[in-house]
Amino acid sequence: MTNITHDFAVVGTDTGVGKTVVTAGLVGWLRNAGHDAQAVKPAQTGYPPDDDAEFVATACGTDAAATCGPRLEPALAPEIAADVADERIDYTAIFETCAAALDRDGPGVIEGIGGLRVPLADGKEVVDLVSELDVPTILVARSGLGTLNHTALSVEALRRRDVFVSGIVLNQFEGETAAERTNPRVLEEMTGCPVYTMPPLSIAKPEDAVAGVCEHLPVEQVLSSVERDPIE
């Protein structure tokens, strides 16, 4: 069994960048390698139909692969969604749900919600949760024009809170434009982080996410970088 035991978070520069697919792939790889890995979604909005924890669980073939905090119907940032839906969500409860997942024997994987500055609950943002849970991060970003600014600012926001960024995944990478072809090198120079690229995946069913991520990302290398958290 590969010796990868570190808890970590998969966060994004924005919504829709591919955090859930990357999370499913990494958790699936860990479980296939013999680890009792579990993803936790701090809160879910746009529910139904959106249910990222259910996607990860289905992709990994077991409900034990994922859990979720409060689910809210409006497709908005959690704190805003709760206000619109006239519901109450509690940051302490969300934190405790995530901390419980990290306290398990196997690796815990926090999946972010939208980007880092998304309002979560009680005036706290996603980046605050990641910082207070004290976990290293894998940052998922878009591949094309504009990602240099968004990604570098996200890395800066994490580092300001002493969060280790172990690597960047540029998702939906096709290399068809000059921006795509140069972004990986430039981002490595700007941030000092290793940058990985992942092409568009054909996902007809959730299980395809695990196979696709494992095929196109150097998963063991990505996860090994999480183990080298210099902040510890």
From Swiss-Prot:
Residues forming the catalytic site: 41
The Gene Ontology CC terms held by the record are: cytosol
Q: Kindly indicate whether the keyword Zinc belongs to this entry.
A: no
Kindly name one Pfam family recorded for this protein. Answer: AAA_26
- What are its GO biological-process terms? biotin biosynthetic process
> So where does substrate get bound?
45
Where does this protein hold ATP?
16-21, 52, 111-114, 171-172, 200-202, 207
Q: Does the keyword Amino-acid biosynthesis apply?
A: no
Provide the residue positions that the database annotates as binding Mg(2+): 20, 52, 111
Tell me where in or outside the cell this protein is found: Cytoplasm
What molecular function terms (GO) are annotated for this protein? ATP binding; dethiobiotin synthase activity; magnesium ion binding
Main subcellular location: cytoplasm
Which keywords has UniProt assigned to this entry? Answer: ATP-binding, Biotin biosynthesis, Cytoplasm, Ligase, Magnesium, Metal-binding, Nucleotide-binding, Plasmid
Q: What pathway is it annotated to?
A: Cofactor biosynthesis; biotin biosynthesis; biotin from 7,8-diaminononanoate: step 1/2
Cofactors that this protein relies on = Mg(2+)
Instruction: Give the catalytic activity.
Output: (7R,8S)-7,8-diammoniononanoate + CO2 + ATP = (4R,5S)-dethiobiotin + ADP + phosphate + 3 H(+); (7R,8S)-8-amino-7-(carboxyamino)nonanoate + ATP = (4R,5S)-dethiobiotin + ADP + phosphate + H(+)
Q: What is its EC number?
A: 6.3.3.3
Q: What class of enzyme is it?
A: ligase
CDD domains (alphabetical): DTBS
Q: What does this protein do?
A: Catalyzes a mechanistically unusual reaction, the ATP-dependent insertion of CO2 between the N7 and N8 nitrogen atoms of 7,8-diaminopelargonic acid (DAPA, also called 7,8-diammoniononanoate) to form a ureido ring. This archaea does not encode bioA (which catalyzes the formation of the precursor for this reaction in the cannonical pathway), instead it encodes bioU, which replaces bioA and also performs the first half of the cannonical BioD reaction. Thus in this archaea BioD has a different substrate.
PANTHER family on file: DETHIOBIOTIN SYNTHETASE (PTHR43210:SF5)
Q: Which family does it belong to?
A: Belongs to the dethiobiotin synthetase family.
Subunit and partners: Homodimer.
What is the name listed in the Swiss-Prot or TrEMBL entry for this protein?
ATP-dependent dethiobiotin synthetase BioD
The record lists the organism as Haloferax mediterranei (strain ATCC 33500 / DSM 1411 / JCM 8866 / NBRC 14739 / NCIMB 2177 / R-4) (Halobacterium mediterranei)
